[in-house]
Regions:
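Alpha/beta-hydrolase fold catalytic core
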Residues: 1-22, 42-46, 79, 83, ...
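Conserved HGGG/HGGXW glycine-rich cap/lid loop of the alpha/beta-hydrolase fold
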Residues: 14-59
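Active-site loop/oxyanion-hole signature of alpha/beta-hydrolase fold enzymes
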Residues: 37, 48-89
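Short, well-ordered alpha-helices that flank and scaffold nucleotide-derived cofactor binding pockets
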Residues: 37-40, 76, 103-107
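Gly/Ala-rich beta-loop-alpha elbow adjacent to hydrolase catalytic centers
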Residues: 90, 94, 98
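Flexible "cap/lid" loop of the alpha/beta hydrolase fold
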Residues: 99-104, 109-139
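Conserved alpha/beta-hydrolase catalytic His-Asp/Glu region
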Residues: 123-128, 138-163
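Single conserved hydrophobic/aromatic residue that forms the stacking wall/gate
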Residues: 162-171
């Protein structure tokens, strides 16, 4: 597997099999490695994975990022690779980026798939997301944050304490 950087220092992988590509957008605090099971499944198809701004090996460009920055990042990668049409899959914040991209650049899309997206978060939910981003910036393993969010302390103390997020999602 060969990973590359484009002119904007976006870290990506393009598996070009001369078919309509699938572009995968990961969630906050993760990187393109979260798509390993899907990469294996789609290895005979064209696909692109990439690290969002400030994630994985793609650096932050600005101290305060907006949805527009993430949407422009995807647009720049698509243009850099000269892709005219593709299937887009987003997970979590990747879904929000995919929605924003679709609203601006619908002519690029063959299909749009949203996984674990959100809609009309409360003020408390928005603050929780900001808190998770701040924790991720401090290098707290995202799997620990997710486990604490998904399971009670009692459950984690008694059951499956050996599991991490990668083993739970089959990575």
């Amino acid at each position: 597997m060969s990973y590359n950087f484009d002119n904007d220092q976006n870290h990506y992988y393009f598996n070009n099999k001369n078919s309509l590509p699938i572009i995968f957008i990961h969630g906050v605090g993760l990187n393109q490695q979260m798509w390993k099971p899907q990469i294996e499944f789609f290895k005979n198809n064209s696909f692109i994975t990439y690290d969002l701004l400030g994630h994985g090996k793609t650096p932050f460009k600005k101290p305060n990022l907006s949805m527009e920055n993430f949407t422009n990042q995807l647009s720049n990668i698509v243009n850099y690779l000269k892709i005219e049409k593709f299937n887009l899959i987003g997970f979590s914040i990747g879904s929000l980026i995919a929605i924003e991209f679709a609203s601006k650049y619908e002519n690029y899309l063959n299909s749009l798939t949203l996984i674990s997206t959100t809609y009309q978060r409360t003020a408390e939910e928005r603050q929780n997301v900001i808190d998770r981003v701040n924790l991720a910036k401090k290098n707290m393993p995202i799997s620990q944050m997710a486990m604490k969010r998904w399971f009670s302390d009692k459950y984690l103390a008694v059951s499956y304490t050996h599991l991490t997020l990668p083993t739970m999602i089959g990575v």
